[in-house]
């Protein structure tokens, strides 16, 4: 029996714009394989929910090497986290229960205030919700939440958050209500939390906040000063964040580095480039077919179709099932991988099991067969994706003959050094014009340039030291400045002028299903994957490492 909530969500989703976003491709090995079968519910959520009985260590087979824990406060913080893990999981459930869908606006304003409340509870002296106004590409931005916490420490760390999520596009596929935060069993884990935003990115961010609150509870202060900035437009190409950062660089004065959430596969900090566009074909611009509105579908017998023209146009942009971009000059500016980078990718590929990775991602198979090719494509590949397409009769079931007058498709285009978004748009426009599609409109929704990562920095060393102490088999760093990139996020706003600080991320913990049905975050770990308690402890240790206190 479908809940009324899911029916409401389904109705809203039909009207939503389905804009794609970034998530790291989980292709490296982990203990998890995402089961798409319904999980067995083991705990309910809500204010009157009973104690969840979380086992902090779960079934994780690896543990912290306490000989590498030098600061006497850290064992106390670890014990506090274990003792309060039920409460910490409930904190995440409450956050999941507050929708924050940036593409529809559902719950965005409430979520911004909720995040400000988290920063207030942390004791930050300055917290504020900013309205960035109209973004560069003409859309209304969502709020940015800023906090500054002066702990009297020597170093200051910027922490990046995003509080927005993707819409629920396939409600019937969810085994639990997407905004309930239910805890279920999902092999090999005894407890995972199901919910929109569970892994992307409320789960790891709540682990960070729980860790910060635990440090405050045990020691009364944090080992570093913090500047925390949370955006509500990550799933909309960071449009408001871009406006905010460019308008207020002074708010980051004195920052030494940035720490971002992440998983235990490796140290991250770089970002691929991502251009998001809409392509529109209309009878009015074309001069053929319906001009002012849709008309009866029977008229196709004698009237041209903008929809068919659009489909033909799309077929000229890519070949090989969409895996090869045909736009002239598209690949021209790509900087080849170095010998060291190729060697590291080959090393990482040895740990990869394609079948297991495909199952974890929820796909039948990857484009390539060889692990080294899959790893290389996922970390330094380019793509021209079809995120969605709509026109005419979009009503589920039934019939109804319509000849649409307009058709629009959405595309995220992933790019790497030294490609640029504006250059891609310029080449696309020239190619469409050459092929006779001068009437096709290109609308730039957003553009996030790529950013490389420096590994020889204090913050990167702090994360690496934590991974070693936690016995995490992570991907080893490459040479100092590497072109091996992560999924897109607005790293470029901090890696370049005027802020220009080193960036690194990575923490224990795991999850899956970002942007998908049954998105989950691991609560009790298994095998070589830590659960939420381990994730929180790793955050605490990284901050102490960065402060030079461990």
Question: What is each of the regions a protein language model found here?
Answer:
Residues 39-107, 125, 271:
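N-terminal hydrophobic or amphipathic helices/low-complexity stretches enriched
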Residues 163-166, 229-238, 261-265, 285, ...:
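Acidic, glycine-rich active-site loops and adjacent beta-strand->loop/helix elements
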Residues 280-354:
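Polar, glycine-rich mid-to-C-terminal structural blocks
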Residues 152, 326-406, 414-430, 439-550:
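An extended, acidic, His-containing surface patch that forms the Zn2+-binding/catalytic region
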Residues 91, 101-155, 180, 187:
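A non-catalytic alpha/beta surface segment that caps or lines the substrate-entry region
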Residues 192-272, 276:
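Acidic/histidine-rich catalytic neighborhood of metal-dependent amide-processing enzymes
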Residues 2-29:
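Gram-negative bacterial Sec-dependent N-terminal signal peptides
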Residues 154-227, 528:
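Active-site metal-coordination/substrate-binding segment of hydrolases
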């Amino acid at each position: 029996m479908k809940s009324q909530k899911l029916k409401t969500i389904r109705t809203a989703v039909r009207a939503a714009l389905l804009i794609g976003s970034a998530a790291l491709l989980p292709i490296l090995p982990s203990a998890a394989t995402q089961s798409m079968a319904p999980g067995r519910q083991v705990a309910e959520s809500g204010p009157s929910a009973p104690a969840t009985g979380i086992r902090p260590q779960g079934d994780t087979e690896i543990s912290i090497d306490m000989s590498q824990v030098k600061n006497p406060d850290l064992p106390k913080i670890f014990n506090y986290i274990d003792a309060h893990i039920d409460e910490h999981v409930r904190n995440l459930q409450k956050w999941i229960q507050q929708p924050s869908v940036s593409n529809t606006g559902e719950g965005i304003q409430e979520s911004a205030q909720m995040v400000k409340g988290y920063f207030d509870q942390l004791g930050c002296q300055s917290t504020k919700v900013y309205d960035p106004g109209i973004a560069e590409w003409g859309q209304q931005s969502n709020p940015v939440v800023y906090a500054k916490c002066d702990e009297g420490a020597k170093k200051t760390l910027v922490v990046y958050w995003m509080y927005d999520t993707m819409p629920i596009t396939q409600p019937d596929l969810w085994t639990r209500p997407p905004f309930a935060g239910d805890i279920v069993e999902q092999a090999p884990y005894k407890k995972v939390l199901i919910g929109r935003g569970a892994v992307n990115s409320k789960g790891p961010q709540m682990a960070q906040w729980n860790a910060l609150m635990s440090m405050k509870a045990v020691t009364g202060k944090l080992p570093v000063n913090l500047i925390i900035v949370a955006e509500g437009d990550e799933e909309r190409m960071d449009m408001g964040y871009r406006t905010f950062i460019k308008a207020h660089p002074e708010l980051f004065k004195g920052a030494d580095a940035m720490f971002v959430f992440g998983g235990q596969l490796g140290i991250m900090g770089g970002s691929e480039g991502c251009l998001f566009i809409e392509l529109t074909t209309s009878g009015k611009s074309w001069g053929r077919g319906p001009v002012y509105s849709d008309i009866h579908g029977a008229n196709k017998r004698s009237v041209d179709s903008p929809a068919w023209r659009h489909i033909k146009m799309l077929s000229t942009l890519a070949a090989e099932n969409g895996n090869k971009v045909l736009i002239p000059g598209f690949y021209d500016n790509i900087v080849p991988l170095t010998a060291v980078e190729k060697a590291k990718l080959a090393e990482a590929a040895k740990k990869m099991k394609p079948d297991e990775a495909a199952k974890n991602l929820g796909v039948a198979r990857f484009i390539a067969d060889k692990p080294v090719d899959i790893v290389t494509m996922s970390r330094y590949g380019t793509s021209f994706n079809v995120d969605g397409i709509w026109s005419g009769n979009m009503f589920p079931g039934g019939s109804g003959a319509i000849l649409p007058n307009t058709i629009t498709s959405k595309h995220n285009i992933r790019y790497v050094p030294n490609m640029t978004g504006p250059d891609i748009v310029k080449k696309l426009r020239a190619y469409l014009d050459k092929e006779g599609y001068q009437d096709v409109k290109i609308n730039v929704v957003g553009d996030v340039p790529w950013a490389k990562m420096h590994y020889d920095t204090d913050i990167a060393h702090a994360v690496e030291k934590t991974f070693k102490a936690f016995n995490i088999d992570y991907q080893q760093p490459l040479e100092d400045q590497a072109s091996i990139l992560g999924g897109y996020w607005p790293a470029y706003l901090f890696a370049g002028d005027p802020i220009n600080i080193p960036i690194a991320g990575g923490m224990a913990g795991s999850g899956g299903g970002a942007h998908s049905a049954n998105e989950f975050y691991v609560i009790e770990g298994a095998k070589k994957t830590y659960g939420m308690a381990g994730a929180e402890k790793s955050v605490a240790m990284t901050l102490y490492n960065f402060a030079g206190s461990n």
